[in-house]
Amino acid sequence: MRHVAAIALGALLLLVPADPAAWASTATAPVSAVSETAAPPDIVLIVTDDQRWDTLWAMPILSERLADPGVTFPDAFVVNPLCCPSRASILTGDYSHTHLVYRQIPPFGRFEWFHDDSTLATWLHDAGYRTGLFGKYIDGYQHAAVTGYVPPGWDRWVAFVHSAPVDYTLTIDGSLRGFGHGPTDHATEVLADEAVAFVKGSTGPLFLELATSAPHEPAIPSPGDEDAFADLSPARPPSFDEADVSDKPAWVRELPPFTASQEAAIDAFRADQYRSLLGVDRAVGRVLDALENAGRLENTLVVFTSDNGILHGEHRWTKKEAPYEGSIRVPLVMRWDAAGWTPGSRLPGVLALNIDLAPTIADAAGVPHPPTDGRSLLPLLEGERGSWRSDFLIEHMEGTNPIPTYCAVRSERWTYVRYSTGEEELYDLVADPFELENVAGVPAMMPVLEERRARLRELCSPVPPGFEDRSRTSVPIALAVLGGLVLVESVASRRTRRPRRAPG
């Protein structure tokens, strides 16, 4: 707990985030020139697995062919930092409290809890798009894949039975095909082949989702990339193997410091992630080439993102799910030449979320869709200066890892977390970007803490299952505070929903 006094003094100068319109005024804002009578655009959505937001520098093809002619959102986030719920949110535009996929195990998790009868695929398919998925769908899909099940809305279906870079099985339009670990078997290359064939074989508008297993562990690189990044320096931010975790919640305090061998494993995995992204980078280029050769590229909206980030040892953690920056932040790049966006635009300070992707794509395609929790990004991309969110909810349900159920609210300046244990975290991201100082227990921070608690009460409704079971009072880790946050909604009063399929 270092520099708390300085953080507290600066924090009292600003209790709420700045007007987002002010952020936009300082951004490099793209302007759209798309005609309402233009042909519907093709849509390409590329979703990687466990890719951090700060890795795009290692993807030169993407930088040259997506970021340079397109728009980058440096402040893009997911609203539940875990593969299964995040992918459900990408396909529906909804929070976990709406689609009810909170984690990767049932109940409230896995494929059988996902209602796939209304998704981005069905919206576009019903509007005349030819749709295809290539890669990872929803965790737990393997139980349905072996029966030949193909979700509604997909015309071409080349999906992992279980996601892996080698030694995997794909279900191709309901038929199973196994792959080994030979030079032509790497999943990134196989999926790119299938995606390119889909572009070549399509007439009319298309929707293509390419969902790679990379750079998820085991991040096995494509053939020829095994020796790349040999000189990659270890990442050692101040939060790496955090020395003083006395102000962190119990789940962090119980994590032991890393051994030398663990640090070496973290560094090796990080290098493998970068190596595996080289194959993804080439896949991006191949899909763009196919679109260009087919005369489609100019009127194609290309979206590149990841399902969540991952921590490389920050706060002694090496996975995702945590409400910390490395876990919740993701890359987000878009290109649509026909829209006339200013090439190389960046929109810093615009809090773009994974729940915004489905309504953005539907808006671009001009197709009707049900109401969503997310909002279309197109008005921002077209230069409008209307109101935009100043903060957003993050929600997560305890699963296979020791992180308790939590709700959090993240703004441009603050991250506030409240766990089902009653523990709280509050970070001033301006003064403390590495989230080293939990100031929830600092008396001078009480006005900020109370304001953030009130905001969380507004956003975290309904609460995640089990959130209200363990504690009905808020107890900051460093200081007991009276009048803490109390969420009064009961499990019985929340909206209930049965899984679409029997588990297993």
Which role fits each region the language model picked out?
Residues 449-456, 460:
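Short amphipathic alpha-helical coiled-coil/interface segments
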Residues 466-480:
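Juxtamembrane/start-of-transmembrane alpha-helix segments at the extracytoplasmic/lumenal side
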Residues 1-7:
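Bacterial N-terminal signal peptides that target proteins for export
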Residues 7-19:
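Bacterial N-terminal signal peptides
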